[in-house]
């Protein structure tokens, strides 16, 4: 409670430590009572796609009293699963393995990534 109060006027996000609680609905109820703004969760699995069923339950239980932000292993192959959950926010690095340690190979690559993120943002806002 004290951390949440100290964080004001900033929003407070409770991170994936939540994924270790034994009774997730009870834990979510506590976060709502504490007035946390957001919960980052993988649905108590290694990746959010594996925990999507619990994430759906958390979204339904929250009834917009707290933002549920799926995170862990979300990428271009599974992001639509989460966009279709009607969440406001998704956490992800959207990284890919590279053959070399170099940064990006060209400005075009940066612009393509930026366009992808802009398109995803537009879909999330719909």
Language model region names:
Residues 9-49:
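Histidine/lysine/aspartate-rich catalytic loop segments that bind and position anionic ligands
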Residues 1-16, 50-75, 106-126:
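Alpha-helix-loop-beta-strand connector modules within alpha/beta enzyme cores
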Residues 1-3, 19-34, 56-64, 68, ...:
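Catalytic cores of alpha/beta
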Residues 36-49, 85-107:
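Glycine-rich phosphate-binding active-site loops on the catalytic face of alpha/beta enzymes
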């Amino acid at each position: 409670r004290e951390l949440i109060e100290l964080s004001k006027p900033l929003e407070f996000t409770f991170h994936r430590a939540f994924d270790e609680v034994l009774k997730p609905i009870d834990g979510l109820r506590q976060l709502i009572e504490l007035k946390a703004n957001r919960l980052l969760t993988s649905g108590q699995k290694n990746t959010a796609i594996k925990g999507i069923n619990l994430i759906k339950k958390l979204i339904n239980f929250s009834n917009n009293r707290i933002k549920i932000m799926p995170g862990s292993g979300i990428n271009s192959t599974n992001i639509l699963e989460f966009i279709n959950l009607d969440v406001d926010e998704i956490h992800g690095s959207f990284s890919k393995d590279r053959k070399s340690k170099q940064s990006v190979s060209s400005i075009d690559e940066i612009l393509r990534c930026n366009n992808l993120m802009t398109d995803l943002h537009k879909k999330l806002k719909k």
